């Protein structure tokens, strides 16, 4: 896999945490959908910079989200692992996707 660096925020507002809890709870008929939405929600709220293989870092929110949606299966797995580790360190009270 290419060398990647994802910079994430270290704070979430109480309102954002409440929104995330609602997303994680999601549609009880589709746990997979709720899981996918929770990963995208966290990425959208936490990602501030993404450097891929030494290229110019992506820092604009719209571009970050567009690149996330275009990510390969391997990149999405790496993003999930990165988000889980970040939640464990900075937000241990939040449920990881």
Residue ranges and their predicted role:
Residues 2-97:
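Short, surface-exposed, charged amphipathic helix/loop patches that serve as local interaction elements
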